[in-house]
Amino acid sequence: MSKNISNLDIEACIATLQYLLDDTNQLFELPEEQRVALFKAAGGLTRPNRDEFQRRRKDAKKAVKRKMIAKDTHARKTTGIRSAREAALFVAPKLLAASSIPDETLELESPRNCYVCKAVYTKLHHFYDTMCTECGDLNYAKRFQTTDLQDQVAVITGSRLKIGYHITLMLLRSGATVVATTRFPADSAIRFSKEDDYNQWSDRLHIHGLDLRHIPSVEIFCNYIEQKYNRLDILINNAAQTVRRPSGFYFHLMENEKLPINELPKLAQNLLKDHVSCLEELSSLSVNSSNTSKNNSLPVTWHGPEPGIGLRNSAELSQIPYSFDNTLQTAEVFPEGELDADLQQVDLRNTNSWRLKLGEIETTEMVEVQLVNAVAPFVLCNRLSNVMMKENTGKKHIINVSAMEGKFHRFKKADRHPHTNMAKAALNMLTHTSATTFAKSGIYMNAVDTGWVTDEDPAALSKKKVEIHDFQPPLDIVDGAARVMDPLIDGINTGKHWCGKFLKDYFPIDW
């Protein structure tokens, strides 16, 4: 059985051996059996045979490697991006003043390849643990860049959390009026109402409930935007379904979502006024409007008598289960009250669709992914481009949030999640096909890869990767948001707009 030997044990051993060397007579006072055992142990330690010598060489190399790994792990832990992840609730790190950035940065014992440029580096950036200094400086500056978007109107989907949440804040803090959609409008409004600078932009944020899986509701939403706004400058198709979550994943949100909007906190109510107006207008147009209030007690279904179920009951639609969800033990895989750093339900399922291959994926999930990631963005671009074309300012943008999964020009393609790959490839083709025509009207359309922000693997596998490899995604959600916003912000600031490009790490790559 292995034993951890302390420094005191080693010092006592050395002192004993030195004592016997100084007074060899003491050796012969020992019982013969003990003396022979001592000589064998000392000799084996100082004069190992060939096999023992080889074993020690291997052990020595392993010990050196362990020390290098431990030192590098400690060094990476000091970077800003990793320090921010230690908090129970994610808070976007503030911009560090130049005087606060240490002149001397830590060096890695083992060289690594930069996440962005792939160059070998050992000098750690103060914020990023996966980038060389040059790429780290560029990426850090991009997190905090701004531009003047005063009087501009933006529509963004998937605005409630993570990348979409920070894109929305960047738009608001640059002066834009933002129409933000989400399936869970009450939760979204509560989140935004807690921002310190809420009073500076709250009158310019309009949150709407919208389930992009229900395309007739997306069409109705486009009608509303066409009637409500006489201009539209920015369209960001951010919402995406990567891993489908069963109804139990969203159950904790339903308490607030089922409340009448006038019973939510006052600051949250203010952000939902336009949504209320939209629903009232929708109700007045319904042929069954007189029965709408009576139908609130009925279960929500995809096929109801009133139009716009994806607007009226966007949150409730998340609670419609599929037959293949019945095998889940909801209380076990979605433990009540356990939320992650983004205040999302912890998901303890052993596997998810990110790990699945063709032949293992439910048809309904494949259809959902196409609706959210490709069909809804098509409808929004198709319909809202007419509003955008009313005035040619020469600096309007459509940004389709894509991913490397949708890229064709790769020599090797992993065989997992083909349904999400299909959807992102379709979104890329939409961008590639239509961008040139839109540019003639001063609308610049691009697709953007957000970078590796989230580990989509099941929780148990993600935990194992952390324990064994000290793995964390190289970027955070603010980096993802900055990448999405860059063609807009950098284009306005420099006057040079990307058009018809697939952007990764702020620069075009092959489709």
PLM features: residue spans?
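Conserved glycine-rich Rossmann-like NAD(P)H-binding loop of the short-chain dehydrogenase/reductase
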Residues: 174-192, 206, 234-237, 244-273
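A glycine-rich helix->loop->beta "capping" turn
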Residues: 202-205, 224-237
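Active-site helix of classical SDR
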Residues: 381, 423
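Conserved Rossmann-fold SDR core element
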Residues: 204, 231, 435-450, 494-502
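C-terminal helical subdomain
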Residues: 279-333, 464-511
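Rossmann-fold cofactor-recognition segment
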Residues: 196-216, 305-310, 317-318, 354, ...
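Canonical Rossmann dinucleotide-binding motif of NAD(H)/NADP(H)-dependent dehydrogenases/reductases
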Residues: 140-185
